[in-house]
Amino acid sequence: MPPVRASVSIAALLSAASPLVAGAPPLGDPIIVTGRGLPPPRAAAAHDIATIDRARILQSASGRLEDVLRDVAGLQGFRRSDSRSANATSQSITLRGLGGNASSRALLILDGVPQADPFGGWISFPAIATDRIGRIRVTRGGGSALWGPGALGGTVEIESAAPGDLDPIDARLAIGSRNSRDARGSLMLMRRSSFITASGAFATGNGFIPIVAANRGPADHAAPYRQVSGAVRAVTALGPATELQANLSAFNDRRNRGIDHTDNRGHGVDGSLRLVGKGALRWSLLGYGQKRRFASQSAAINAGRSDSTLILDQYAVPSTGWGAHGDVVRLSGDLELRLGADLRAVRGETREFYQYVAGSATRRRVAGGRSLTTGAFADATLTEGALTASLSGRVDHWSIRDGRLFEQTLTGTTLTNTKFADRSGWQPTGRAAIAYRPGGGLNVLASAYRGWRLPTLNELYRPFRAGADATATNAALDPESLTGVEAGVDWALSANAKASFTVFTARLHNAIANVTVARGPGTFPGVGFVNAAGSYRRRENLNAIATSGAEFGFDLRPRPLDVHLSYSYVDARVRDDVAGHALNGLRPAQTPEHQVSATVGWTSPRDLRLSLTARESSSQYEDDLNQRMLKAAFTVDAFASIPVSRHLAIGLRGENLFDEQIEAGISTDGTVERAVPRTLWLEVTLK
């Protein structure tokens, strides 16, 4: 665009916005817009749901989404590390002990759009700044007819902040330990029945040394990070009961794992359009597109940890995802009927150099494919006095196509050129739920459900290495499915107090796991040579993972006090009789039995905000054979916001205040990697 035309365009935009800035009176009554989707279904009364409100989201000591989600015990990532030091591919989420795999078994959505990486299924947490979030709803348990494939353990629904959540201008700048800096800002512009928001976040730091002091060597150094994200959101009324919502966001993520040749790089762009009708006939129509690109390096380190060498350069992982979702809700007295359909298509591949000799790659690999799921669903909920009964179901057709694995030497000799057979099939999803309110604030609920998940392209086609260990691919993996039942009670003790208790049991059929087949040294199919410090693994479908447990929640909010307690117990066991697996009866990797999170907050009439959060996660196994155990982890975080004036506040934040050693991983030689140590922050907020 020529400079003159750009100046005219910007001037026109400013002119259009000037009535708002000047406070010009509206022409007629404005239509209220919220930017949100349809209200939760009536069936939610029979579901185990935890809600994290905006006030709590903004009081996270780290300011990171994965830390906020830890308020819900039982909702966990594959690793204890957060997105400042973890390998991005390990950042999945799951619920109720359905672990053992770094692909997400819970579905995370933002304004209706799935956020899992199209190729690998991991979550790019730095892409979602907490300042732009209005509310988080966590529904435990599978069988979501509305959201469909991927919601095995449950669903995490994130809503963007509404106009009532935001100030016209909000800027935050924080400095922290190890030269950490965190800057965030947002703008909101409202005009009659429309609003637009723009937000940005920047985080960087020198990082900490991931390897614990007792194991580290000269090759170990701090793990720096640099992350940027931005989002623009526009919402306007198209009529008295119809909203048009447009979202555009982007991120760039760079981090290092604490030794040379272990860089992670990722960036992406998401866009979506959603129409929401909130009249007598409620309806929603969403379309979205995602573009991602990821790169990662892996290194081998010598016995004395004095030197590292590059062994794999995953120089590009381009992927795209797109989809659509539509539903209509009809209310007829005590009956709510919801009908809809959706689809999601993903395509991606990994491009990498491997088998290094004297510091130079000798081979190249390209592996990937595409998949498509399409489904239709229905949900009927009847409310008759104190009783709510819900029956929902959906049918999905899935297909996996164009899978390939190509390997060649850099001199041009083809080593592998495999084109995998296309596959397709059908999968059902369903949930039957009931809730009864006998009085006295009690709500007794029970449900039975079935859900499923399609293997990611990463699981199907990409062999990988993690340190000395190597894992072979398996293009014949079947979809996972889950069946489960649960029962519980919600008790509104008073207007300011609520308690909940739920017991559950579930079985994950065809659970995908990285199964240890042999120990090095040796040369193995699909991965090549593995040294004596490593293990050879292969992705396989286990018979099942059986999980059962209990969850307890308590909220007390007699202003100015705010108390939140969440506890989860899970007994998860592998059920597998396949010869050579030797996993039957063992716990899935990275799956703790006990998790608890407790927060006490206080807000003064003059908006002084204080909170203290303690979390405990019991010991868990690093590996599928249950030979390496990560110790229990206990942390205490603190937050304080001190108002200086109407528009200025000073903040103090502390992560892991007692500087506990949080074990995040143990290699086969016993080397321990830790998660974030004590980190202190000083923050200035301008509104």
Mark where each language-model region is:
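Short acidic/polar hinge/loop motifs at secondary-structure boundaries
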Residues: 113-140
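Surface-exposed extracellular loop regions of Gram-negative outer-membrane beta-barrel proteins
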Residues: 291-295, 347-356, 397-413, 422, ...
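Flexible loop and strand-edge segments within Gram-negative outer membrane beta-barrel domains
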Residues: 205-211, 221-227, 237-283, 289-319, ...
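Periplasmic-side early beta-strands and strand-to-turn transitions of outer-membrane beta-barrels
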Residues: 144-145, 157-159, 164-174, 178, ...
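Gram-negative outer-membrane beta-barrel transporters
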Residues: 382-389, 498-508, 529-624, 658
